[in-house]
Amino acid sequence: MVKTQRVVITPGEPAGIGPDLVVQLAQREWPVELVVCADATLLTDRAAMLGLPLTLRPYSPNSPAQPQTTGTLTLLPVALRESVTAGQLAIENGHYVVETLARACDGCLNGEFAALITGPVHKGVINDAGIPFTGHTEFFEERSQAKKVVMMLATEELRVALATTHLPLRDIADAITPALLHEVIAILHHDLRTKFGIAEPRILVCGLNPHAGEGGHMGTEEIDTIIPVLDELRAQGMKLNGPLPADTLFQPKYLDNADAVLAMYHDQGLPVLKYQGFGRGVNITLGLPFIRTSVDHGTALELAGRGEADVGSFITALNLAIKMIVNTQ
């Protein structure tokens, strides 16, 4: 019999739709135990607002994990700093959000949990609370002391990884170095094999410049940096196609023969993916010593507590994490 695994969930910003979505997740059975790192009253109040049943059972790390039954969640309690009104940010709760992320991350690092699924956070309120915070990806990279992580978003049809993440456009060309590309492609290739079960990953690589530099007439980063790195990695046996112009890469001619796309920067690759599958996408952090997936949307403060939030991305993120757990066993 396969051992039941525990996954930990952080609902994210307490005034947003994250708690709503977690309550909605509880309305179905799951083959894993869902441990929610959150304030108990927050969850029960939000369930009452949505008119949905919810029973919280205490987290017992020394007991065997049990598949989650309908209407229940396992609670790993973290107390709010301020009471919550749905849709209204409270600066002190920025500390609460970071505490949930830290506890969940530490639990993955010490083997308590097989995966971490994160709800949407509000970066502004965390920074307003005096906590420098760029995003989940960078937070988990630092806390886990990972050498390097890679952000990848995925739908059922498309996976897009990023060579750089949250950088201003003016800084991107300088950031695309041979060392960076070697690291990013190695991590992407490794995790596609180990976490996604793809024996020989096929990766499409975007150029940085329009028309992938047009032979050096629209920038030389392809000639100076990207092509030499790809040639070296191909010589090691990796299946890499590129650099290709980003404006023509995202079509069936190329995508039908690829397992993932590597974009050079955030807004090069993600608009295509989000247009194609918004609400069904999943954010995955590659390179961490544990599995981490996330929703692909924001806090939607205006929908909190109204019963109008779509749980689809959270369900997809959880299902993908479960598949990744199976692939790594």
From Swiss-Prot:
List of residues binding substrate: 136-137, 274, 283, 292
Transmembrane feature ranges: none
Cofactor: binding comment: Binds 1 divalent metal cation per subunit. Can use ions such as Zn(2+), Mg(2+) or Co(2+).
Stored Pfam families: PdxA
Subcellular location as annotated: Cytoplasm
Pathway: Cofactor biosynthesis; pyridoxine 5'-phosphate biosynthesis; pyridoxine 5'-phosphate from D-erythrose 4-phosphate: step 4/5
Annotated a divalent metal cation binding sites: 166, 211, 266
GO molecular function, one term: 4-hydroxythreonine-4-phosphate dehydrogenase activity
Any one GO cellular component localisation term in the record: cytoplasm
Gene3D superfamilies to which the protein is assigned, alphabetical: Isopropylmalate Dehydrogenase
Keywords: Cobalt, Cytoplasm, Magnesium, Metal-binding, NAD, NADP, Oxidoreductase, Pyridoxine biosynthesis, Zinc
Keyword NAD annotated: yes
Enzyme class: oxidoreductase
EC number: 1.1.1.262
Domain of life: Bacteria
Reactions performed catalytically: 4-(phosphooxy)-L-threonine + NAD(+) = 3-amino-2-oxopropyl phosphate + CO2 + NADH
GO biological process: pyridoxal phosphate biosynthetic process; pyridoxine biosynthetic process
Note: The active site is located at the dimer interface.
Subunit structure: Homodimer.
Matches recorded under HAMAP family: PdxA (MF_00536)
Known role: Catalyzes the NAD(P)-dependent oxidation of 4-(phosphooxy)-L-threonine (HTP) into 2-amino-3-oxo-4-(phosphooxy)butyric acid which spontaneously decarboxylates to form 3-amino-2-oxopropyl phosphate (AHAP).
Protein name: 4-hydroxythreonine-4-phosphate dehydrogenase
Encoding gene, per UniProt annotation: pdxA
